[in-house]
Amino acid sequence: QKFVSERGGGFLMLGGMESFHEGKYLRTPIGDMLPVYLDLDEETAEPPGKVQFQLAREGWLQPWARLRDTESDERARLDGMPAFEVFNRVRALKPGASVIASVRDEKGGELPALAVQRFGRGRTAALMVGDIWRWGMKDAAAHDDMDRAWRQLVRWLISDVPLRVQTSAEPVPADANGAERVQVRVRDEKFQPVDDAVVTIEIEPVVFAGTAGAAGA
């Protein structure tokens, strides 16, 4: 949990018989990180049968969740995905989380399939489909699509990972000389703040070459 919340790492839970509610992750540090609630009774947790994967509204707005340039091509790709048979139900989405993809069961019901959220300095995701590998087994093109989808999801998960040494500069208010205030944040191996860090900053002048005719402009 600290790896995600303090280090800025990413965490993804995949569906399966030992995941989510079925894996007894309720009231555990891992369960607390997930973007979904796991408290279900056994009747509610029953698998929904075969389900069809589709993008939710938020998924259509996120470039990393899409694999095609146009909506029509993306819908055609989604329609060509196989039905999935292993699915973990969840009770609800946690506040601040987003549903990127959903599934539709044989009765027309819609259930969250891919949910994401920020958790401290990091990000977490939950993919409730347990046999997503079926997608890549369809043909070579589908396998390439699945590989690309994994890459894009992982990039999203780790896109905010901070460096151990970070610098920022901002103008000093009401300073006629254009002074800048430079801040340096240093963290140790466990990504805890270092209060007595010794930092050396080297500043070099930048010379801008003039363009021809600039003097007479």
Predicted feature locations:
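N-linked glycosylation sequons
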Residues: 1-217
